[in-house]
Amino acid sequence: DRPRGDVALAMKVTIDALHMRSTIQYSTWAPYHWLLDREDFDESPTWWDDTTRVKLLRGSHVLEMARKAEKDFENDWDVVKDELAEIAVDERLFPSVPMDFLREVFRRAVAAIHSRSFNTSMPGEEACDAAQESERTVLVPVLDCANHHRQPRECQWQMNPIHHWEDRRVDIGKWSIVVGALKDFKPGDPVRI
C-alpha cells in the first residue's frame, strides 16, 4: 500500500517538531508548534483504542472509517519510521530517537494535518496520485485557527506566489495565502473563513 499524500507534509512537520525539541534555535514556525503542542489531538476516533470505538460507535459507519484510518496511519508509520529516525540522527537532533517518542510526534503531525490542513487544488481540479495530493496539502498557521463558515461565504482565500522566495533568509515557502472579505465587517464582528 502506498502512503496517503499527506505523509510527506507530516514528515516535514515531524522533523520541524523534533528541531523544536532538540535545539534552542527555534524555527520560523516555533509559535505554531507551541500552539499545536497545546492540542490533545485525540478527539478523532482514529486515535481511540478499539474498545472505546466499539462502545461509542457501534452501529455507525464511522466505526469502520476510524478503523481504516488507524490502519492507514500504521501503514504510513511503517513506511516512514526508519527514514524519520535516520533524518533525526543525521541532522544531529538526537543521538538516537526512541521509536515510541518518534511515533507520537509523527502521529500528532498527521492529526494536525487531518484537522487543520487546506487543500489548495483549484475548483474542479482533482489530484491524480498521492504525490500530487501532497503538493496541494498545506498548513496555514493562524488561518487554520479561524472560525469556518460556508453559507453564505464571508471571506475567500487564495494562494499567491512569493517572488524571489529563494533569496529570503528564512524558508517561508514559495506561496502566501491572502484572505479577502466578501462583505463589510463592523468592528467586533467575527471574521469567518
Model regions and ranges:
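Long, positively charged leader/targeting segments at protein N-termini
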Residues: D1, H19, S27, H33-I193
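Hydrophobic or amphipathic alpha-helical targeting/insertion segments
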Residues: D1-R2, D6-V13
